[in-house]
Amino acid sequence: MKQKSWDIHLEEMMEAGIHFGHQVRKWNPKMAPFIFTERKSVHIINLTQTARFLSEACDLAANAASRGKQFLIVGTKYQAADLVVSAASGARCHYINQKWLGGMLTNWSTIETRLQKFRNLEKEKLAGIFERLPKKEVADSERRLSRLRKYFGGIKYMTALPDIVIIIDQRKEFTAIRECITLGIPTICLVDTDCDPNVTDIPIPANDDARASIKWISNKLTLAICEGRLNSNANCMNS
């Protein structure tokens, strides 16, 4: 796919508060190239840099989607949890919006087995098998199913490791980033002024705390994924 602008406008980014970083005393010096200035002891992110890296991330996402690649969106902080579900659902991506369990990717064979058990339990419930079990077994099965839904609901149909992982908060999801690095899975990550931009493939300098900022950027990324998938379908129809 050809590169495009993705309708990234500085005014919209300012309205979403994407430029507000953390307090100066909390900064990571590696973020210096992405900081415009400081105001009232708070770093202000250079939105020109945000636009540049977000555009690059959208290009990557669209190209990958056009080739049938699979995405995993990770955001477990309370400000992001529901936004992650909405963004992932709209773009048909897998997601994790509760606790990241260690080994989610690096111990994939075990996770895959648990996902199969999850799918089987749901089939049994739908088939009415739970109704024929003793009360204690029903309670145990419901409890297991509830826990599986909480932690694995967003990856229930993920049958292989993702090709690209999109991460909302680098510091919060550092275990996920380490697993991606170990496995060589490319990452796109929002990086606030207290983050390390060098541990992700495409860092997007941005406020990773404000809901408006998270929503605006995740919408751009998932829009690019959707456009890539549409392009893939058009190519299939024309071939």
Swiss-Prot record:
Its main location: plastid. GO terms for biological process: translation. GO terms for cellular component: mitochondrial small ribosomal subunit; plastid. InterPro entries: Ribosomal_uS2, Ribosomal_uS2_bac/mit/plastid, Ribosomal_uS2_CS, Ribosomal_uS2_flav_dom_sf. Keywords: Plastid, Ribonucleoprotein, Ribosomal protein. GO terms for molecular function: structural constituent of ribosome. It is found in: Plastid. Belongs to the universal ribosomal protein uS2 family. This is Small ribosomal subunit protein uS2c. The gene is rps2.
